[in-house]
Amino acid sequence: MAETNTAALRAQGERDARALTVTGRRRADTGRIRRAGKALARMARAVTPETPNGQWLRDNRSFACAAAGDAVAALRHARVRASGGQTALGACCAGLLRACGGALTVKAAEAYLEGFQDALPLETAELALLVPGLQAAVVCALAESYAGDSAAAPALFTSLRALGTAAWGMLAERCDRVGRILARDPVGVYPAMDAATRAHYRQTVARLARRTGRTEIEIAEDVLARAQRSEGCLLYTSPSPRD
């Protein structure tokens, strides 16, 4: 799918999200990520001049294995929403990679995530794990590619390297629906905060959502409504869990 076809990417993201049913919480299948990294290392040792895209694997093996390790370290303790036998975050990342044909760009990711979150907004913790989730998706896709014809390998390796750039690090906040709600603060307190303070505030909203059983979107909308009624003062303190 072409990078510039943002409408199609957004529509695909929404379709993918609507196909999911949240069934609880679980940890990511980090064993699958480890196995994919080990498979790439094993296949790299067996590369011959005749191996399709074998040089790509030789040149990038260490980087791919390191990315697999980074993804495992980030994901292994996180309990995020589940859908069937996978996490919603994992399904989102795999769907994005598939929609991009393995060639990730920030522009394409923003379009897909807009559509995905129209149907299923990502939680603060899920957004924080977006890059590790995408690293995991790419590493697993690479292992699958080299188990077949490896045609997708160049695009996948290029995507994996791009995920380490600053542009991808900033993507999560730009796609954060809770932050967008809080940014409508009538006196401009939230938008004036530095990045670390905004992140702390979103984490506070996330904790209140877990404590009360409400969604983060509901908590953020409640905070905004209270701020509008009291000229924004509630955005200087922790949002209240009470209605």
Feature annotation, model-predicted:
Residues M1-A7:
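ATP-binding pocket architecture of kinase catalytic cores
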Residues D16-S83:
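ATP-dependent phospho-/nucleotidyl transfer catalytic cores
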Residues A46-P49, G115-A119, R177-D185:
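Short, charged/polar, low-complexity loop and linker segments
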Residues A73, S83-A91, S238:
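Active-site-adjacent "gating/activation" loops or surface patches in catalytic cores
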Residues G84, A99-K107, L122-L130, A166, ...:
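Short acidic, glycine/proline-enriched loop segments that cap or flank alpha-helices
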Residues Q86-L127, L134-G148:
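Active-site activation/catalytic loop segments of kinase-like enzymes and analogous catalytic loops
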Residues S150-L235:
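Soluble N-terminal domains of membrane-associated systems
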Residues Y236-D243:
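Conserved small/polar residues in nucleotide/adenosyl-binding loops
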